[in-house]
Curated annotation (Swiss-Prot):
Enzymatic reactions: tRNA(Lys) + L-lysine + ATP = L-lysyl-tRNA(Lys) + AMP + diphosphate
Positions annotated to bind Mg(2+) 1: 406, 413
Subunit comment: Homodimer.
Gene Ontology MF terms: ATP binding; catalytic activity, acting on a protein; lysine-tRNA ligase activity; magnesium ion binding; transferase activity; tRNA binding
Family listed: Belongs to the class-II aminoacyl-tRNA synthetase family.
NCBIfam families: lysS_bact, PRK00484.1
One Pfam family per UniProt: tRNA_anti-codon
Keyword NADP attached: no
Names of required cofactors: Mg(2+)
Protein name: Lysine--tRNA ligase
EC number: 6.1.1.6
Amino acid sequence: MSEEMNDQMLVRRQKLQELYDLGIDPFGSKFDRSGLSSDLKEEWDQYSKEELVEKEADSHVAIAGRLMTKRGKGKAGFAHVQDLAGQIQIYVRKDQVGDDEFDLWKNADLGDIVGVEGVMFKTNTGELSVKAKKFTLLTKSLRPLPDKFHGLQDIEQRYRQRYLDLITNEDSTRTFINRSKIIQEMRNYLNNKGFLEVETPMMHQIAGGAAARPFVTHHNALDATLYMRIAIELHLKRLIVGGLEKVYEIGRVFRNEGVSTRHNPEFTMIELYEAYADYHDIMDLTESMVRHIANEVLGSAKVQYNGETIDLESAWTRLHIVDAVKEATGVDFYEVKSDEEAKALAKEHGIEIKDTMKYGHILNEFFEQKVEETLIQPTFIYGHPTEISPLAKKNPEDPRFTDRFELFIVGREHANAFTELNDPIDQKGRFEAQLVEKAQGNDEAHEMDEDYIEALEYGMPPTGGLGIGIDRLVMLLTDSPSIRDVLLFPYMRQK
């Protein structure tokens, strides 16, 4: 082994060998359970101690799980067995299970996985328990669990050894069960609205659909450079061109960027597209869907996050980005007429910008540096500048802006959406402008995608599209402060 075994580990290895010597498989086979601990409690906890005595003949059960506590000496003892649904107490007596199985019980360690068959009863303190008639060792644990009273105190160890976190931390287990339910309800909502779930490539020849730095890989057989996708967008819009009018995909996206409490190099997104819709329709859909998910998973659309009550039930605020900046700073970007004027205002208000930035970039910097973190309750910010929205349709009344929105809750972006740009000539011009930005040092600027332009030339109907970061949504709905708390296996720097 790569590490020296401590005394407890050595004792467990010795017990392992003793089991082999007795002809007992310490890594047993299938065990048929009658239910989870929660099922037993739901069915039997309603009865009194006396009623359970009367019903003993009908209360035969079989449970399995991990030994989390163990106490008792002599010819009887108690333990708590933990399964996915929680814990239930077992009571093991020598005269009930026999000498051989009682020896198994006596030598069992915390962390061992056991199977118990028996009948239901209540102790003198009223705790629902299983009186063992048969005790089986299913898996011998060769390492001791973390201290039962303190669990995993090292937050980094919780992330690196998630299996230990799940064993010892009920809140973590509940978070990941709710994550699964959130994604399930998202699918239910969209499927009921007539959307079709699809799968598109994760390796792209061109990194597109978002402003981000990609991971690069190489296909040896084809001698081709490929990029792990930074967005799902462009393939889904090709499907809209092809006549699949309402599509969505839930999948992994990869961005070669920093790691923080809000960012992981690989994360989960949903993107959806609806033909003959615009960003107003998508705004309505987003609000309705998130509210539905909260109600179905949590039982309420008023959720707690970091001590704050977030009201997903009431109508969400809708605010133009220019109005949001004006409310926060007094600067009215509707009246700003040139890049130079915007740069002067940035300097006046202490906004950090790059020399190459234009009007739209500077407006966005005002928003990100002065407004974004103040948006605690659900707020749709719409009307983003054209310069930072290369795939969104221009607003017909003021072409400086696009028909785009982002959703902010607890000071974080949770969704990005727009009326899709379906004019291939305009789209090509936007890509060309992005290439200029890339040449000026913007690593996140969009590449030219001639194949996508060709698809648009066949005609894409008016379309509304949406992207939601599922990890951030799960953070919100589970009151989790870090993205690592909602990823089973987050990226960790090598030790």
